[in-house]
């Protein structure tokens, strides 16, 4: 469907359901005219911008709800258009009724993410900042929120824009040397100077790329597979980490017949905990499917928590699990330390963590070891640092580095500086896709379609 970018749009901006407040948002040139048709209270033409005004929403003289209406005039709004927010009593019926009234009064239903898209199109935010809005909404921990806020505040955008400007200056210098070789007041872009500039850009982007692992973990969570043979305490460990009972815990082997996924906040790091079915040979078809899914989860995990029974000697199944997980980021947990120890610790390859999920012992040690393994006990989010957390951004930085490598390769082959402009220009264009300066319309539409309705 083709829609007019300048239509006045509306949507419910709060989750549907029972609650104290529901918000119907309107943005566009007709926002004030629409609210005046349905609002009984102060004359909204006379109220200052960025004020909240008491009154009623009415239709044909009948009161629909008692409301507070926020009036925010362009250009000092999120969309840089006139914005009205109707604060209703929360509830499905009343909020939907007011939304339908706004639609009948001349607004169009907003597409998902269209408010933020307008903020981008009107220059209020760039594409990286717009994506940070969604990251902020989806953040599962305070550290993930901090990274999203940094990006929303422009830390990544400023770094990218400054780098693009330096690349542009380099390209301009090459052009001047070509077109006006007689100018003595412009430094000549020699091979040595081009190499120096290229290495400078490579170093900056390489250092930025080094933050991707940490940033991506904070944004998407640390995929953590809990593995072990049946009935060693995997589900109990999951419940202990979650601080609530999510998995069924029994003495019957094979109780967990599928893969259970839950998120938990470990010192600011979101862990996507995957409680796998015990990996063993089985004739039970349903359990067999669960075992296969467990093996797949193990292959894809960022972290493996291997649970062994310290009250029993190592079994063939234990040894198989030790072998198939040896190339993973792994912590070995010896459970049931409240019972006499039987396991052969001298045959285990790493320092193990002795725990008792029944008595909730040493769960905090697991959390500390995870922090050490992935963050070297450093501050998880450093003040004033810039982090890459978005897979799209990471891919573009990698592409930009490949273009810079092509410039270096050309320099090594003795190619003239002016012939290397193509790859340097490509680097500039690729970085522009991060902020949206050089992003195709199809990409922009696709990105905003992933946003919430009303955002």
Curated annotation (Swiss-Prot):
- The entry marks the following residues as binding Mg(2+), namely 235, 256
Q: According to the record, how does the cofactor bind? A: Binds 1 potassium ion per subunit.
Give the protein's cofactors: K(+)
Which is a Pfam family this sequence falls into? MnmE_helical
TrmE-type G domain: which residues? Answer: 221-375
Q: Name one GO cellular component term.
A: cytosol
Q: Which residues bind (6S)-5-formyl-5,6,7,8-tetrahydrofolate?
A: 25, 85, 124, 455
| Locations listed in the record | Cytoplasm
| Enzyme kind, highest EC tier | hydrolase
Which keywords belong to this entry?
Answer: Cytoplasm, GTP-binding, Hydrolase, Magnesium, Metal-binding, Nucleotide-binding, Potassium, tRNA processing
Where is the major localization of this protein? cytoplasm
Which GO BP terms sit in this record?
tRNA methylation; tRNA wobble uridine modification
Q: Which residues bind K(+)?
A: 231, 250, 252, 255
Gene3D superfamilies listed in its UniProt record: P-loop containing nucleotide triphosphate hydrolases, Probable tRNA modification gtpase trme, domain 1, tRNA modification GTPase MnmE domain 2
Q: What does this protein do?
A: Exhibits a very high intrinsic GTPase hydrolysis rate. Involved in the addition of a carboxymethylaminomethyl (cmnm) group at the wobble position (U34) of certain tRNAs, forming tRNA-cmnm(5)s(2)U34.
- Tell me its family: Belongs to the TRAFAC class TrmE-Era-EngA-EngB-Septin-like GTPase superfamily. TrmE GTPase family.
The subunit field of the Swiss-Prot or TrEMBL record says:
Homodimer. Heterotetramer of two MnmE and two MnmG subunits.
Q: What is this protein called?
A: tRNA modification GTPase MnmE
Q: Which organism is it from?
A: Streptococcus mutans serotype c (strain ATCC 700610 / UA159)
